[in-house]
Structures are given as C-alpha cells and as structure tokens.
Amino acid sequence: MARLNPIADAMSTIKNAGDAGKGEVIVEPASKLLGAMLRVMQENGFISGFEFIDDGRGGQFRVQLSGTINKCGAISPRFPVAMADMEYWESQYLPAKNFGILIVSTSKGVISHAEARNEGIGGQLLGYVY
C-alpha cells in the first residue's frame, strides 16, 4: 500500500512509540526532509538522537526517544506563513506560548519557529511537537 504522507506517518509512529514507553523506534521511509525535521527535534531536546540505516529500499531512521514528547504531528496542507503571522499559527497548534515548537521549512533550511522569528523569515509549516 502506498504511503500518502510519509511525514505524518513518521510523526505518528514517534508519538505512538513514546506513548507506549519505548526507548527507540524505526521510522521508514527515510528522506532528507524527515532527517532535517528529526535534527530540529533533537536540537530542541524532544529526541535523544537518530541515525540513518541503509536497508537498500529507501532507508530508515532509528530514533532514540527521550520521553519528553506529549504530542507531535504533521501539518497538512503545508501552510505558507509569514514571520508576522507566526504567533497565530503558534496559538493554533501549540497548547501555550513558548511551550513546544513548530517545525518550519525556510530559505535557510528546516528550523524551529523560534529560530525563524529570530531570523525574521517565514516559510512553510511542516509539523509541531510539544
């Protein structure tokens, strides 16, 4: 069966493994975008680490969970957001101000919404984690 949204599948796999109390989870298929999103999650302390595993079929990521994820998900459709509108989207997807992150694809790469606000740039919303 074809995967329609591999980013949403990966985020729900991570959330379900965290809810089950697992220490690590395998996420497939791997992509550069998913790797960049995992890097942002690691920089913000939501996962302990991740590594790429080449299985000859597109690859996988082995993600070490830190147990700090309450909820995570993909944002679909990927809304374009200006820097001035970041606070509106933060209130839509995060439970409180400065609690959790929005993952944004910008011209400077995939970064958190706080970094995008500091840089003064907008982008497209990819996901949220808190």
Curated annotation (Swiss-Prot):
Disulphide bond pairs: none
Keyword Ribonucleoprotein: yes
Domain of life: Archaea
SUPFAM superfamilies (UniProt xref): Ribosomal protein S8
PROSITE patterns registered for this protein in UniProt: RIBOSOMAL_S8
Keywords: Ribonucleoprotein, Ribosomal protein, RNA-binding, rRNA-binding
Keyword Transferase listed: no
GO biological process, alphabetically ordered: translation
Any one of the GO CC terms: ribosome
Record InterPro entries: Ribosomal_uS8 (IPR000630), Ribosomal_uS8_CS (IPR047863), Ribosomal_uS8_sf (IPR035987)
Subunit structure of this chain's protein: Part of the 30S ribosomal subunit.
PANTHER family: 40S RIBOSOMAL PROTEIN S15A (PTHR11758)
NCBIfam families named among the record's database cross-references: PRK04034.1 (NF003115)
Record-stated family: Belongs to the universal ribosomal protein uS8 family.
The protein's role, per its UniProt record: One of the primary rRNA binding proteins, it binds directly to 16S rRNA central domain where it helps coordinate assembly of the platform of the 30S subunit.
Full protein name: Small ribosomal subunit protein uS8
